[in-house]
Regions:
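Short beta-strand-centered aromatic/proline hotspots
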Residues: 112-150
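Short aromatic-glycine-(Arg/Gly/Cys) micro-motifs in beta-strand/loop hairpins
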Residues: 27-56
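Mixed-charge, Lys/Arg-rich low-complexity intrinsically disordered regions
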Residues: 74-122
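Non-Sec secretion/translocation targeting segments of pathogen effectors
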Residues: 65, 189-202
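Short N-terminal "domain-start" leader segments
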Residues: 1-38
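Structured surface patches comprising rigid loops and adjacent beta-strands/short helices at the edges
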Residues: 163-176
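A short, charged, amphipathic alpha-helix used as a generic interaction element across diverse proteins
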Residues: 60-75
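A short macromolecule-binding patch
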Residues: 47-51, 156-166
């Protein structure tokens, strides 16, 4: 990608809106008189986390492609709304008062930590996206030089990598929701079973 200019092949990106799990791009190449306007989707679902463009559509009609662009954005908004409607727990995010501060002199391994809301996309700034179990990574250690913190989301069970500075703090036990306690039990039980299998295979 050229400095100050985002490109998709020969097309210059003029509009980009990120909603949910992807970004919708509108790009222009005035040199292609037969198809100067292009719309595509972009995500980063790969080991290197680089731009991955897909589902392109092109035309010489600006209004047609702008309509395609806005339709895709609307479809993503509806998908995120539908996803949120399925959530069965209170959504109000945790703040600093719910946590012990992120003390770099202490280990956070195997502790339930809270992700800072500002590190989450606006549509995901809810408690179900904040609560995670820190399961490993150099960033979990006390006085660590590393930053990586590998986590398991208590609501979805999905694994993710964060940096230590993305963490607001360790959740105070008195604020642990009932649903999170149950999910934590299941996650820990699964980890113990997996560890037992690995030991038996040696």
């Amino acid at each position: 990608m050229t400095e100050g200019k985002r490109m998709v092949d020969t097309y210059k990106v003029t509009h980009a809106i990120h909603v949910g799990d992807r970004e919708i791009l509108f790009a222009v190449d005035d040199g292609k008189t037969d198809c100067p306007y292009m719309v595509c989707d972009c995500n980063w679902d790969n080991p290197l986390g680089i731009d991955q463009f897909f589902d392109p559509a092109g035309s010489d009609d600006y209004l047609e492609m702008m309509t395609e662009f806005t339709n895709r954005v609307q479809a993503q908004l509806e998908a995120v709304k539908a996803e949120r409607d399925k959530i069965t727990v209170p959504l109000s995010p945790f703040t600093q008062e719910h946590c012990t501060p992120n003390n770099y002199g202490e280990s956070i391994e195997n502790k339930v930590v809270v992700i800072r809301t500002e590190r989450l996309r606006h549509e995901y700034r809810t408690v179900n996206n904040q609560l995670v179990l820190a399961v490993g990574g150099f960033g979990t250690y006390a006085n660590a030089r590393g930053r990586a913190v590998y986590t398991v989301n208590l609501y979805s069970g999905k694994e993710a990598r964060w940096n230590r500075e993305d963490i607001l703090g360790v959740l105070k036990p008195e604020y642990m929701p009932g649903w999170a306690k149950e999910q934590l039990k299941q996650i820990l039980a699964g980890q113990q079973a997996k560890h037992k299998e690995q030991v038996q295979e040696r």
